[in-house]
Amino acid sequence: MVNQAILDRLRTRVEGERDSIISFLREICAIPSYENQIRACGERIATEMAKLGYDEIFWDKMGNIVGKIGDGDKILLYDSHIDTVGVGDPDEWQWDPFEGKVEDGVLYARGACDEKGSTPGMVYGLAIAREMGLLDGYSAYYFGNMEEWNDGQAPHAFVQTEGIRPDYVVIGEPTKMQIYRGHKGRVEFKIVAKGRSAHAASNYLGDNAIYKLLPIIERISHIEPQLGDHDFLGQGRITVTDMEVKTPSINAVPDEAVIYVDRRITFGEEPQAELERLQNIIGQRDDIHAEILLYDEPSYTGFVFPLDKIYPAWAFEEDEPIVLAGLRAAETLFGQTDTGKWDFSTNGIYWAGKAGIPSIGFAPGNEIHAHTVLDQVPLEDVVRSTEWYALFPSILLNTLQG
């Protein structure tokens, strides 16, 4: 049990920062940070961390902003990606997507839900935790990173290039203030068909690459019942998501066509086996092949960290110490709390899926609003989440000590 006097002091301390926390969120939402351009947003976060007395503030090689606080042996990292998707068609927004609006206690703005909404609570929570002695035994990091275009790349690069490997991670993707403990993985493929171009008036002289892919697309659309299933993570999924065509003109037979396939995988589904599944659909032929995509785009700093687009599934049981600690912190502060999972993918694919680091998710917001013109977060939850981020380290330490 947590001493009631400590809880009262924590709540009073967070309430005293309410206006600062909300203003901080509105300011970082007002700074565009799509297409990995996070520098300006990161600089604003760095200013806030400096004001709060973080011990170290630095940029990693990829261009992610990092703040360190505390000097204990255990390494705890709070992960919040601060890049966002674009706004799409501006005419679909009924308000400025960056300035946003507050209505009935909810902030509507690009990135409010996904996922700048977790940054203020993390940044303030760690500072308050140290001030109150709730961070004793830890070196804690806030990691404001790029995730939208290749989830898991930023943490992978951070660990490899900076040499900092957390013992525990909290992911700030929206969880509705619940404790999330996993999600499905995915693999991204492309299928390339080669044909022969000809003038559309003499199409019989050509070999249409688009037509070659049509039966493959049809077969892919029917294979989902054959895919794996898991009691917690759910059913595997497969979707043809995009198509590109190479053709001399719109009056010519295309000589190349490419489709992209998003394959959501659960436990027991291996990337190589899924590649073979697609190759079996294609059959033995020289003019069509499937391959796993490679991500090798440079970040805004010019940093390149090539990775195959393989994202492992991950999940922890409810009796895992970090899950128990997350639940205990939430129940202490808010009452009964559930565990859950994300439907989409997060940086957990590296932290837990590849590196095996105990990880959970906790944040305000509901993922159904991510990437939409209704991107939103309840401001009360943003403020109250600060209490959780401050209390969690000490609850985790007590849980680990039994």
What does each model-found stretch correspond to?
Residues I45, T119-A129, P155-F158, L213-I216, ...:
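Buried hydrophobic packing segments
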Residues L77, L107, R165-I171, E188-K190, ...:
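Short glycine-aspartate micro-motif
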Residues I75-Y141:
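Active-site metal-coordination/substrate-binding segment of hydrolases
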Residues I69-D71, S80, K184, G195, ...:
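A generic beta-sheet turn/junction motif
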Residues D89-E103, R181-V192, R328:
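Acidic-glycine-rich active-site phosphate/pyrophosphate-binding loop
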Residues E115-E188, Q401-G402:
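Acidic/histidine-rich catalytic neighborhood of metal-dependent amide-processing enzymes
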